[in-house]
Amino acid sequence: MMRSLYSGVSGLQNHQTRMDVVGNNIANVNTIGFKKGRVNFQDMISQSISGASRPTDARGGTNPKQVGLGMNVASIDTIHTQGAFQSTQKASDLGVSGNGFFILKEGKNLFYTRAGAFDVDSDRHLVNPANGMRIQGWMARDLEGEKVINTASDIEDLIIPIGDKEGAKSTKNVTFACNLDKRLPLIQEGANPADIARGTWVVNKSLYDSFGNVSVLELRVVKDLNTPNLWNATVLINGEQNSNFTLGFDNEGALASLNGQPGQKGDILQIPITFNVLGANVGEVGEQQTVNLKLGTVGSYTDSITQFADSSSTKAIIQDGYGMGYMENYEIDQNGVIVGIYSNGIRRDLGKIALASFMNPGGLAKSGDTNFVETSNSGQVRIGETGLAGLGDIRSGVLEMANVDLAEQFTDMIVTQRGFQANAKTITTSDQLLQELVRLKN
């Protein structure tokens, strides 16, 4: 039999394989997180008719004579280039801008994917709803009253506790960073109510006790009649006078003294106020609560009460307490941190999504569901947080589309078709030659 017959057969078989890969790419053009394949060919071993000879004094050298025996598939590569993002506006839809993979777990087995169409199941786990695999990361833990995420610990299932309660927290500090208008008029003795109102800076702030009950702090500040740059302040709690103090400023509008005691530059001026809160039962007087009024830093303009010839402000006043609330929603930032949003306005870090990378992502094996698994040639998985070692950032509200270029695939399809036709022609022509040989006998 002629070698060209078998060369043509190998060409047909392997061009069919290439067509299978092209067809799979086109079929998955709209598959979220899909990575296209590419077929590379190589020639097979060649049969030597004669070897090479070296040159002599009388005659030059000759090259080897070899006849090829066809071709085969050298590799079928998975191309892990970045796909374009499609906006969905859904918080749990995620895409990776970089080289990282999301980590999924089923039982004890880990899978890796770029398809980030996730959701929260009835057990409040963050999962891939197509197969129920759970997304891996790190949950936040309570440490001295703060939520801390330890990314050095082992990865675990991520839980988003929609509907969970956040208990009330009593107010410990009220921080002021507002401005007192230096142009406010002095309030003379015997002034009428209108003049008193024009010359008084008043601000109200809600304070919380450990039950979530609200008390109203009212601060009234007026210019001192006798001393420039000095202001007299009165604190009222729930409409009842609580305490008094004075604030002094330097000639550049920065806070300088409290109750006549000048501070050094950088000193924090603060004053405690104490009042009774409601008890556990209706009408019962509870324990005393102390709240620290942080009035500012001596010599600072950014985190202190100031005195400038500009409108008095009331917005830059912050207190650290809150009432009871329920988790209503969540969002995921570009660092992969899941942030719970509560009905009382509090935001809590719930956990962080982990990403995986490999020395050779092309060595990963496809396992279905747009997932990959580790192989001996992918290298061991390296798990980390976003922004490290090329893992990239996480985008919320988007999905990564397939990296299939239809123009490229249609071109490959045409080239593959012509290659298949050419190899088929090799077989038919070889058959015609064999027929001629058979006819020689007749």
Swiss-Prot record:
Subcellular location: Bacterial flagellum basal body
NCBIfam families recorded: FlgEFG_subfam, PRK05682.1-5
Species this chain originates from: Borreliella burgdorferi (strain ATCC 35210 / DSM 4680 / CIP 102532 / B31)
Sequence similarity: Belongs to the flagella basal body rod proteins family.
Alphabetized PROSITE patterns for the sequence: FLAGELLA_BB_ROD
Effect the entry attributes to changing V174I: In strain: HB19
PANTHER family: FLAGELLAR HOOK PROTEIN FLGE, FLAGELLAR PROTEIN
Impact upon substituting N192S: In strain: HB19
Keyword entries, A-Z: Bacterial flagellum
Protein name per UniProt: Flagellar hook protein FlgE
